[in-house]
Amino acid sequence: MQSPWKILTVAPLFLLLSLQSSASPANDDQSRPSLSNGHTCVGCVLVVSVIEQLAQVHNSTVQASMERLCSYLPEKLFLKTTCYLVIDKFGSDIIKLLSADMNADVVCHTLEFCKQNTGQPLCHLYPLPKETWKFTLQKARQIVKKSPILKYSRSGSDICSLPVLAKICQKIKLAMEQSVPFKDVDSDKYSVFPTLRGYHWRGRDCNDSDESVYPGRRPNNWDVHQDSNCNGIWGVDPKDGVPYEKKFCEGSQPRGIILLGDSAGAHFHISPEWITASQMSLNSFINLPTALTNELDWPQLSGATGFLDSTVGIKEKSIYLRLWKRNHCNHRDYQNISRNGASSRNLKKFIESLSRNKVLDYPAIVIYAMIGNDVCSGKSDPVPAMTTPEKLYSNVMQTLKHLNSHLPNGSHVILYGLPDGTFLWDNLHNRYHPLGQLNKDMTYAQLYSFLNCLQVSPCHGWMSSNKTLRTLTSERAEQLSNTLKKIAASEKFTNFNLFYMDFAFHEIIQEWQKRGGQPWQLIEPVDGFHPNEVALLLLADHFWKKVQLQWPQILGKENPFNPQIKQVFGDQGGH
């Protein structure tokens, strides 16, 4: 699963053609292209493809196509301004090359955003030109021979070095690294701001100047004078003088939901409209600034902690919304502690962002769902980089000990197993990617090969034409799942009960097929890897039903006072 500071600033902006970043750890493998070069190449090919296809769809010049793309982008985050800066810098050469029938691969190699290092294979997304690659590239370089652009591109210049963008880039980078809200006046890890790790990720603060006021805490003096736990229930019933919090919530077993996850749990999503020329319009990019400041994640629509109405038209709700429906006293008590690229190995770097006080707060349901990155990487040989069962045991035990020292007594922890990711190749490899649908010139197999060649694939092991490698990856995933299962069966902790649940994606596929759907419709169309919103909500439904059947004590009681809470407090202040 992606760990993309570079993709965050390049692909989503569509303009990250020369960005350098430090979000991903340095790699000791010198044979691997630098992450900066790999992601920059992907960003360039994506942008040039969109420009070329916009010209085709609208029967316009390349110049008009570039201007059209910029006109679609919002002013927020200087997206439109940055787009015009890029056109000014690179536009004339892109026009010359596309006018000479060079494809996006050739354009990006000519402008040196893609580079073939000595001894390395040629990485290309589209079919190779009919003439030899060497001849085509020489021809393209002659076309732009006198251009000052190549000097600029070689300099490694960073879009974030532009004064207008420096602060924005820094904000996003800080939020990603620390996994706590950037805007948090009282430093209680809760915010009144939605993105940059704000209330899209954890319940909205209702008093950002008082660190003792935050979602999930036990009420202070039954919230007679203020709403100390932000669930929208406070004050005193004038009829009998009993505090509403005491009347409606005492003994109802309130609890929160906390997800420790990766990009799947955070709901990584790149909208197909952003790269599909035939669907592109002024409305396509309205939500791009929000997505950028959420690291291309959509936790507000995720299966675990989503609180907004689904955008995909199915009736299933997130686990958090089901907990709220069961007991309205649980309002706003959710935390999505997920990061792109997270695994059992690096969870310790951001688990401190979890907010729970053993004494002051209600118990929590914690879902540990590191479902991919312990077997996934972009390395040319991904098998040695996979987490071993022994190392997973050590990592998870360290996490559980941390949870035991922070969670209130009566909490519950569920360890999620890993999926069998062979369904990705099986269901997508021969289908056209959104970028390839217009001209029927690019399948998911080509996308996977391109990303693997650049060593920026989110999961080389499963996104590979090599069946043996796909099988090995699934075998290791099964071994790790069995390790989690053994931990749940044998380990005991004082402050929480421990459970294990299979990541039963095959059951989700079967359920979707019963409704007339196809398996490929459950996968994110742009990256061809992550479960999409439909899949995440179906997984939440599967989780809820299994827990209800096997471990109903995890969910707490149904609150008989829910109707009265709604009558007195309406939507409880919303989310």
Swiss-Prot record:
Domain Saposin B-type residue range list: 37-118
Regions crossing the membrane: none
UniProt entry tagged with the keyword Lipid metabolism: yes
Keyword Secreted assigned: yes
Site (Interacts with lipopolysaccharide): 345
CC per GO annotation: cytoplasmic vesicle; extracellular region
Glycosylation sites: 59, 207, 409, 466
Modifications made to the protein after synthesis: Cleaved into a large and a small subunit. The small subunit is N-glycosylated.
InterPro entries: AOAH, AOAH_Saposin_N, GDSL, Saposin-like, SaposinB_dom, SGNH_hydro_sf
Binding residues annotated for Ca(2+) 2, in chain numbering: 186, 188, 205, 207, 210, 213
GO molecular function: acyloxyacyl hydrolase activity; calcium ion binding
Pfam family, one: Lipase_GDSL
Assigned EC number: 3.1.1.77
Alphabetical UniProt keywords: Calcium, Cytoplasmic vesicle, Disulfide bond, Glycoprotein, Hydrolase, Lipid metabolism, Metal-binding, Secreted, Signal, Zymogen
Disulphide bridges: 41-114, 44-108, 70-83, 123-453, 160-169, 206-230, 249-329, 376-459
Organism domain of life: Eukaryota
Reaction(s) the record says it catalyses: a 3-(acyloxy)acyl derivative of bacterial toxin + H2O = a 3-hydroxyacyl derivative of bacterial toxin + a fatty acid + H(+)
Residue sites binding Ca(2+) 3 per the record: 223, 227, 229, 231, 233, 245
Main function: Removes the secondary (acyloxyacyl-linked) fatty acyl chains from the lipid A region of bacterial lipopolysaccharides. By breaking down LPS, terminates the host response to bacterial infection and prevents prolonged and damaging inflammatory responses. In peritoneal macrophages, seems to be important for recovery from a state of immune tolerance following infection by Gram-negative bacteria.
Name recorded for this polypeptide: Acyloxyacyl hydrolase
Organism encoding this protein: Homo sapiens (Human)
